[in-house]
From Swiss-Prot:
It is found in: Periplasm. Pfam families: YdgH_BhsA-like. GO terms for cellular component: periplasmic space. It comes from Escherichia coli (strain K12). Keywords: Periplasm, Signal. Residues 1-22 form the signal peptide. This is Uncharacterized protein YhcN. InterPro entries: BhsA/McbA_stress_biofilm_assoc, Dodecin-like, Stress_YhcN-like, YdgH-like_sf, YdgH/BhsA/McbA-like_dom. GO terms for biological process: cellular response to acidic pH; cellular response to hydrogen peroxide; response to stress; single-species biofilm formation on inanimate substrate. Belongs to the BhsA/McbA family. SUPFAM superfamilies: YdgH-like. Gene3D superfamilies: Flavin-binding protein dodecin (3.30.1660.10).
């Protein structure tokens, strides 16, 4: 249940605009019409969901992705997120 709450919170935050990012966070319906090009994972200690989003954006940009979908997220004292990348 905690994972679903974290993913839902990240999805809501990804809809809000906090500056220019190279890759857009998308949902499962939007991902169906795109070409998957790989996955990335990020992790950290004691940081905010926005830090996770910024790290995912940076990795997506480095891989040449225009969008990503968060497929897994865990939080607590340490956190981890995995995202599928799309063109």
């Amino acid at each position: 249940m905690k994972i679903k709450t974290t993913v839902a919170a990240l999805s809501v935050l990804s809809v809000l605009s906090f500056g220019a990012f190279a890759a857009d966070s998308i949902d499962a319906a939007q991902a169906q019409n795109r070409e998957a090009i790989g996955t990335v994972s990020v992790s950290g200690v004691a940081s905010s969901p926005m830090d996770m989003r910024e790290m995912l954006n940076k990795k997506a940009e480095e891989k040449g992705a225009t969008a990503y979908q968060i497929t897994e997220a865990r939080s607590g004292d340490t956190w981890h997120a995995t995202a599928e990348l799309y063109k």
